[in-house]
Amino acid sequence: MIFQSFLLGNLVSLCMKIINSVVVVGLYYGFLTTFSIGPSYLFLLRALVMEEGTEKKVSATTGFITGQLMMFISIYYAPLHLALGRPHTITVLALPYLLFHFFWNNHKHFFDYGSTTRNSMRNLSIQCVFLNNLIFQLFNHFILPSSMLARLVNIYLFRCNSKILFVTSGFVGWLIGHILFMKWLGLVLVWIRQNHSIRSNKYIRSNKYLVLELRNSMARIFSILLFITCVYYLGRIPSPILTKKLKEASKTEERVESEEERDVEIETASEMKGTKQEQEGSTEEDPYPSPSLFSEERWDPDKIDETEEIRVNGKDKIKDKFHSHLTETGYNNINTSNSPIYDYEDSYLNNNNTGNTEIFKLQLLDKKNENKDLFWFQQPLVSLLFDYNRWNRPFRYIKNNRFEQAIRTEMSQYFFNTCKSDGKQRISFTYPPSLSTFWKMIKRRIPLLSLQKTLPNELDNQWISTNKEKSNNLNKEFLNRLEVLDKESFSLDILETRTRLCNDDTKKEYVPKMYDPLLNGPYRGTIKKKFSPSIINNTSLENLKERVRINRIHTIFLPNTDYQELEQKVDTVAKKPLSTEIDEFLTLINEFGNEPKSSLNLKDLSLFSDQEQGRVNSEKRTKFVKFVFNAIAPNGTTSEKKSIGIKEISKKIPRWSHKLITELEQQSGDYQEGVPLDHQIRSRKAKRVVIFTANNQNNDPDTKDTDTADQDQTKEVALIRYSQQPDFRRGIIKGSMRAQRRKTVIWKLFQANVHSPLFLDRITPPFLFSFDISGLIKPIFRNWSGKEGEFKILESREEQTKREEKKEKDKKGENKRKEKARIEIAEAWDTIPFAQIIRGYMLITQSILRKYIVLPSLIIAKNLGRMLVLQLPEWSEDLQEWNREMHIKCTYNGVQLSETEFPKNWLKDGIQIKILFPFCLKPWHISKLYSSRGELMKKKKQKDDFCFLTVWGMEAELPFGSPRKRPSFFEPIFKELEKKIGKFKKKYFITLKVFKGKIKLFRRISKETKKWLIKSSLFIKKMKKELSKVNPIVLFRLKEIDESNETKKEKDSLMSNQIINESFSQIESGNWPNSSLIESKMKDLTDRTSTIKNQIERITKEKKKVTPEIDISPNKTNNIKKFESPKKIFQILKRRNTRLIWKFHYFLKLFIQRLYIDLFLSIINIPRINTQLFLESTNKLIDKYISNNEINQEKINNQKKIHFISTIKKSLYNISKKNSHIFFDLSYLSQAYVFYKLSQPQVINLSKLRSVLQYNRTSFFLKTKIKDYFRTLGIFHSELKHKKLQSYRINQWKNWLRRHYQYDLSQIRWSRLMPQKWRNRVNQGCMAQNRNLNKWNSYEKDQLIHYKKENDSELYSLANQKDNFQKCYRYDLLAYKSINYEKKNDSFISRLPFQVNKNLEISSNSNTSKHNLFDMLGNLHINNYLRKGNILYIERNLDRKYFDWKIIHFSLRQKEDIEAWVKIDTNSNPNTKIGINNYQIIDKIDKKGFFYLTIHQNPENNQKNSKKAFFDWMGMNEKILNRPILNLEFWFFPEFVPLYNVYKIKPWIIPSKLLLLNLNTNENVSQNKNINKNQKQNFFLRSNKKIKNRIQEAKEPASQGEKERGSDIENKGNLGPVLSKHQNALKKDYAESDTKKGKKKKQYKSNTEAELDLFLKRYLLFQLRWNDALNQRMIENIKVYCLLLRLINPSKIAISSIQRREMSLDIMLIQKNLTLTELMKKGILIIEPIRLSVKNNGQFIMYQTIGISLVHKSKHQTNQRYPEQRYVDKKNFDEFILQPQTQRINTDKNHFDLLVPENILWSRRRRELRIRSLFNSLNWNGIDRNSVFCNENNVKNWSQFLDERKPLYKEKNELIKLKFFLWPNYRLEDLACMNRYWFDTNNGSRFSILRIHMYPQLKIN
């Protein structure tokens, strides 16, 4: 057995070794490459298919294999790879070759094609076949399925150690695959040739010569296929001649580009080197696998040459390299033998000869412009033909405001090299290429022996020791901090703060976060900082001058320098010789640009400001450059001696040298300076429609010509109209190839829209594939339930609404179809060339024809006609109407201009002609007597008061609409005639009728008498016969019986028929879905019954006529018994039976019908009725169950409101048992209740709920029905697990709630939420007076002990750190809870840190009282755990006193109200009573700051006296009402804008109390003054550097600002001066700031406009929100206004358009200063503040979900009632104390529960501590890296931080497993650290999958 298992084990391991061996993998990957089929196979197939002898086949195969072998070798051998993989060589060689080959195939006599001689080697065609196959194999193109397969070998080569072995085995694998393929192909061909069925095919036999033809034309077929592939690839190759060359951004930038190339030269060259496989690797990233004939490399082509040279031929080539590069950029005029260029390398290495290079650079620059045009032909051919800067690939042009040009994305970001990492030599894939090149150069210079080689162990040990030292230091520091904590000497200094880069020591200003390297790491941009001249004061100017001058010169010399480099190079240029010229230099700059650039603005690379740069022509520039150089030239000797300085090695980001603009930007003129005037990016087809031009004369003599041109432009009001056709351009750049674009596949012959194949499934499938199953099933069910009687009543209403909806839908659909048709027509006119011109002229001719020819002639004809018919002519009326008709020229969109004015470019853009009051010819005009009826008609036709003229002279409702019907001229005439004829006919017909009737009667009488005579004669004959046979008495008796029975039967049948008809008519009356079917059935039935009736009637009539004299009543039938005999009875029965049998069929049918109706339907309806009743009853039960006596009014209210998470209904009755026990199982009660409540309102706002309710834990529901109901509503998903219900504690639940700040809306969002009446009703409920409220003053003082008397330093640092800490803590807790949620009852963290206010509450007694099966909840208020500010918006609980904010109405219009509103600082009168509700105002509001007013829980709230609100769910007695941030009246103080801005930028630094400082204008002015003295700086100043638009106040010194503030405060609430001051500031501000670059500054006419602009620009998001109808009306109004503005006398049209309701005055209220409040009240304008996390600040990412970033220190007070729970003693983190149930909790010591001890450290240091201590370096040698996660022995213990001796838990001594989320504390860098590479990725996409618990479990003994 052992032996067997041993053998088996060996076998397995052997197999694994074989499978993993290089050879096997190589074979596998090689085999896979066979499947990448390219055009090279075409030649091979050709040789096989065309029977040209074996020699050709052999040569083809060998050529094919040789080509592939070369490709494989090229992977490993670099020179060959460079030769084959170079784009230009292949393109240049391939195209001519392909074309040559194609033509050669078509000319048979070119060589002796086809005929083989004996000496076959001399025959050229065989060599050609070989060459074809060889060369085609080298072209790296493919057809099926993807080039990826061909590249697999290259990719896998990275992982292999023995590369040659892998390459050879790969080739062998390919060979095997190829041989198999060839064999299979041969078999197929043989089978085709030999297959009898193919040969005996009828079609082939009938066309005998078809096969021969095919065989003969095989060569042609192949050449056609080849040509197609060639053309296909030609489309994808950047052809050197045809593509459009983009203009460089500007001449300076060209210069820069060349400089940059020179600077980056070495680096990019070496970048190409990498490892040999690197080029192939880069193709992986290529969005198009192999887009051209060869694998087009994605970098600078010339640099590939250089790499080659460096790699292969070493040092000698370098000098040529530099030279060749210079020639390329146009420096080839220098005589190389004499120039110092050969010293360049030496100077680079040895720092000598720098001066020469320096001067040499200058010379080059100077001469470059002259020589550029002269020597262009001397540039290398490659770079002339294939400019790598050309935008050949259809990349998107992604603009970047921070950088000058767009970054080139196609550069590989990987460069592989070995480096020291973790004490070992490892391969790094982001190694700086310049370093490796530099190292190689050093190696060549210095002999290898002198370079010390460090042993690997040395490295390792050194690294380990330094690491140990660092980790020890960290641990020490950490422990020290913890010890300080233990000693109870708590101060915030224990918490480590983040180091920030300081900008200005005096003002304590930090660098903005975006630019702070200590926060964000090295940032890829440089700061663009612009100082306006007024801000820079004298001292700073002095400091700047020297630096700026030198830097400016530097920007000319070394264009692409960085700020850091500059610091090192300040001394390189001699300062003295420059000083004389420099002032002229600066003045010159100032002439060109208004603003001097700051020292940081080096990347601008221009000597001129943004506005002017485009305008300064090249002559000025060259003069200027010469001036600068001449100024320096005499002193050149001094600069020679200086060293060039050490260059910092950094990777230059490759950029495009173009700045491109879109078509749209070109039209609107929004582009910046230095950009070509012509657009390069093709925008969507659009037309600029000018709707209004104001021709204001420019009277200002000072303005220059350029300005006037600008002004004229701005006077045009234009709309941009996009054509409705699909956008095939999609921002493509001119000259790039459309064929290569991704995601724009066109697969149809005519395709309306561009589709990405990704969304194929979304496209509506063709008709064949769509099966409407439900549509098929419905009618079947309808038929089945077709005969229901009662059900119809239930469904009728629903059906009716459905039908109505369907009608509406159809109508909408019809409108949409019409709209679509109109658009299509419009687009057709737009797209066809010259169509607009033709259409325009046609319209104008039609207009003239209509107005002046057709209509007048019609009027004349009509009136002449009237005269002929002897009626009065109506000349005046007709002419009046004709005059009223107006033809107005409109733009193509239908914007009205005027009668005379044509739209701009109307021939090109198109025109519409709108006819107002179109003339309609009427046969007569209605007199005034009939006007009342006419008015109604008019009202109906008011809409038809205008129309658009079509090309054929018809009238259309809308442009390009279908022509409408005109009321016919003859129709009323005909109607009148018809009426008269009708009257005449009536009289005539009446007489005719009477006459006819009489004739009929006469004829009938004659007929009847005739019949009667015949019948009576026959009857008499019969009677005679009968009488002779039978006794006469019997005869009469029998007749009697017979007659009576028959009549009875007839009556019966009549009755039943009637009933049936009635019942069916009832059924018919209902709204049946399948009525047509039922109708048809019923018709059949009624037809049958009626026929029976008729028959019966006819029989009876006949009988009556025959025997009129015998009239025997049926009553006498009883006498028959006397005369009965069996024989007679039998006869009667027989007769009856025959009749019954005859009618049985109908009876049976009727019976079944009745049975169905009575029985079957009732059976069907029983369950329906039952379920309905059941549901209703359950609803009622639940209603009763949950709220026994609810106010009905509340229900009504609930339906009106949009509800928040739970609308907890208030109940106003007392419960006898007051002392409730709060400790109970929440899962049973609260959520069920919440869900029930959610089902109540008509409108459910689910968007916020879903996230809360969807969690896969215990199901909330006692009844599955409720659950199903919510599932259908879509509130949660169905996978709720039915686990064991968990027990929650109230405080845990509250703590959970407290952390979900989504639901805790900031107070600004709420203003007057509900109608006042309703609020009053709630507030007027009985309110128990609370005695304890008087203790508030003392309490406030206690609470504010830690607020540390408001002085600046404390205020900022304390608030900042504390809030930050709380934020962190909350993240931790969230993380902890979400991981350890199973052990809720054991969780030992349940409180927030920093319980500043000692706001204690008494634990409730544990006497429990049950009510209605539900545990009662204590009266705990949510205000203690919601943000304090939000108390304003909670509906008041009835037994508390609050300050009711809603009483004070706040309106912008009444400034006095603002004053009163602010005056609520009640130091003067602490017990002010406001309003009827006697709310007591809380004092010291100013201390807290207006935004965070706290309302405290009652300290000694006696629960026995407080009224229990029934079902106070989780203590949430106050209802929270959800509203969006709509009524933001605060922000409409101009006062608040800068403040808000400051707060936005530094939310941690400025406590919000500062925001209202200026508005606290109350009696205690002195106190406020004191506060202000403490805060010496004007906070406007503080915000200045952050706010882009500088507020004018900042320009004044701080002292002046303070004086102003003092005076403001003394105004005692009169905010006028404050506001006006600010408005002045705004005015100044807007006069200074330029709103658009390169444009004239914008002047504001009014303050409102300026304010509006300020709001809408930066601080607020605004939306114009209206419904479609309003939108439509708005547009209509605008169109009318456009017309009215042009008319000289607009009143007439205005009035008529108002009458026609074209123009609605309510919408377009023209006011001089439109008040925003009005718009907001109407709900049209919605303004919301931009959230604090708007832009690029990673720290605020979580803000959207949890608003911790806004938390102020006064906001959180923890609810400290923890019944029956043990409490953490702060002294010892791990000790629990059992509290007596009624004892007050001791929270006097201000400690906090540390969830994670390391939170003391800052995040970066925390990370370091973790990584150093947890990933123990010593254990890495023998262990797999990931074992850290599972091997607990490796994990350092945390017992040093947590006291081991004491048990952590109450009864259990469990392990605490502290797991950490990846997100909250430690960002993604940790993950990158794990792998010991800092990933160089542009975005975090690679990380998105890693949702892991990163840190190992923390083990505590």
Swiss-Prot record:
What is the topology of this protein in the membrane according to its UniProt annotation? Multi-pass membrane protein
Ranges of biased composition (kind: Basic and acidic residues): 1591-1611
Tell me the GO BP annotations in alphabetical order: protein transport
Transmembrane residues, as ranges? 18-38, 64-84, 87-107, 124-144, 172-192, 221-241
Q: Name one GO cellular component term.
A: chloroplast inner membrane
Which InterPro entries does UniProt cross-reference here? TIC214
| Region (Disordered), start-end ranges | 248-299, 797-817, 1591-1618
Give its localization: Plastid, Chloroplast inner membrane
Extent of Acidic residues compositional bias: 256-268
Q: Which domain of life is it from?
A: Eukaryota
> Which UniProt keywords are listed?
Chloroplast, Membrane, Plastid, Plastid inner membrane, Protein transport, Transmembrane, Transmembrane helix, Transport
Query: Where this protein primarily resides, as one coarse class?
Result: plastid
Signal sequence extent: none
The record describes its quaternary structure and partners as: Part of the Tic complex.
- What family does the database annotate? Belongs to the TIC214 family.
Summarizing the function annotation, the protein's role is: Involved in protein precursor import into chloroplasts. May be part of an intermediate translocation complex acting as a protein-conducting channel at the inner envelope.
Q: What else is known?
A: There is a partial copy of the N-terminus (positions 1-349) of ycf1 in the inverted repeat (BAE46710).
Q: What is this protein called?
A: Protein TIC 214
Organism taxonomic ancestry = Eukaryota, Viridiplantae, Streptophyta, Embryophyta, Tracheophyta
Question: What's the gene?
Answer: TIC214
